[in-house]
C-alpha cells in the first residue's frame, strides 16, 4: 500500500436495536420482505422492492424470478451454477421457511425486517430455522438483483461515498475480496451502510449484516461453495475477482439511497 492510498478497515459497526427498527418502518425493509416473484425493472432493478415494506412472515414465500437468463452471466458465473443456485438452493430456503411458518402460524404477524433485526422475538424452538432460511431467502434476493450482464457506471453520489470511506472503488473491492477470502467455511462478504458511513464486513452461513447491527447491506457476495465451485473449484479468490464484472451499480445506487432515507427517518 502506497502512502497515497487510504487504509481500509474491515469492521463491524455497532448499532442499536432501536435504530434498526427505523429501517423496518421505512422503505428499506421493502427489499427483504418478498413473498411474490420479483421481476426487476430494467432501469431501476430494485425499485419493485419498495412495495414489500409491510410484508410479514405469514407467507407463502415464493422464488423471485431472475431479470436475466441463467446463461447471461457467463463466462463469470456459468449457467449450471445459476440453475442450481437459484432453482435448488434458494428454493430450498423458501420451502423450509414456508414449512416453519405453516407449523407456527403465531409468527405470521411479525414483519420480515423486524425478525431479521431481532431474532429473539421468534420462539427459541424455531429460531435457528428462521435465522437460516429467512436469512437465506433475503440474502439471495439481494444477490440476484446485485448482478447483471450489462452493468452501468455507479452514480457520482455513490462514487463519492465510496471514495470518502475506502479511498477508491478498487480499494473497496479489494477489502470485500479480502473479507470473502477470510470468511472460514460458508458465508457472505458485504458492504454495509450505517448512518451514511460505508464499511466492509462478513457474516457466517446465511446471516445478514443487520442481525448483528453492522448496517444495511448495499453489496453482498455469496461465498458459499455452491456459488462458485462448479467453475472455480477451490479458487474462491478467482470467483470474487470475476464477480465484480457483473455488479449492478443501479441496484447498489438504489440500496444506498434507501439506506440514506432510512438513516434520515426518525426512530423515536
Residue ranges, per PLM feature:
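Hydrophobic/aromatic-rich, well-ordered segments within soluble, folded domains that form packed cores
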Residues: 85-93, 138-141, 219-229
Amino acid at each position: 500500500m502506497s502512502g497515497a492510498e487510504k487504509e481500509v478497515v474491515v469492521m463491524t459497526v455497532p448499532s442499536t436495536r432501536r435504530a434498526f427498527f427505523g429501517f423496518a418502518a421505512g422503505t428499506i425493509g421493502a427489499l427483504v420482505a418478498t413473498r411474490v416473484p420479483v421481476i426487476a425493472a430494467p432501469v431501476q432493478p430494485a425499485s419493485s422492492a419498495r412495495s414489500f415494506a409491510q410484508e410479514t412472515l405469514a407467507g407463502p414465500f415464493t422464488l423471485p424470478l431472475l431479470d436475466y437468463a441463467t446463461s447471461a452471466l457467463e463466462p463469470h458465473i456459468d449457467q449450471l451454477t445459476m440453475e442450481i443456485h437459484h432453482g435448488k438452493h434458494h428454493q430450498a430456503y423458501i420451502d423450509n421457511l414456508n414449512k416453519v411458518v405453516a407449523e407456527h402460524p403465531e409468527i405470521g404477524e411479525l414483519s420480515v425486517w423486524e425478525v431479521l433485526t431481532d431474532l429473539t422475538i421468534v420462539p427459541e424452538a424455531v429460531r435457528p430455522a428462521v435465522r437460516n432460511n429467512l436469512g437465506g431467502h433475503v440474502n439471495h434476493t439481494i444477490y440476484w438483483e446485485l448482478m447483471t450482464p450489462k452493468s452501468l457506471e455507479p452514480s457520482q453520489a455513490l462514487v463519492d461515498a465510496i471514495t470518502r470511506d475506502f479511498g477508491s472503488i478498487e480499494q473497496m473491492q479489494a477489502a470485500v475480496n479480502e473479507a470473502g477470502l477470510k470468511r472460514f467455511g460458508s458465508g457472505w462478504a458485504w458492504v454495509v451502510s450505517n448512518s451514511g458511513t460505508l464499511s466492509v464486513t462478513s457474516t457466517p452461513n446465511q446471516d445478514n449484516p443487520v442481525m448483528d447491527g453492522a448496517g444495511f447491506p448495499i453489496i453482498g457476495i455469496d461465498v458459499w461453495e455452491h456459488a462458485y465451485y462448479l467453475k472455480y473449484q477451490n479458487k474462491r479468490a478467482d470467483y470474487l475477482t470475476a464477480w465484480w464484472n457483473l455488479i449492478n451499480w443501479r441496484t447498489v445506487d438504489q440500496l444506498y439511497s434507501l439506506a440514506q432515507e432510512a438513516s434520515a427517518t426518525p426512530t423515536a
